[in-house]
From Swiss-Prot:
This is Uperin-7.1. Transmembrane segments: none annotated. Expressed by the skin dorsal glands. One of its GO terms (cellular component) is extracellular region. The keyword Transmembrane helix does not apply. Keywords: Amidation, Amphibian defense peptide, Antibiotic, Antimicrobial, Secreted. The modification Valine amide is found at V13. GO terms for biological process: defense response to bacterium. Its main location: secreted. The keyword Glycoprotein does not apply.
Length: 13
């Protein structure tokens, strides 16, 4: 889902 994308971005930051 889109939340997985959000967590991915959060981890990248």
């Amino acid at each position: 889902g889109w939340f997985d994308v959000v967590k991915h971005i959060a981890s990248a930051v």
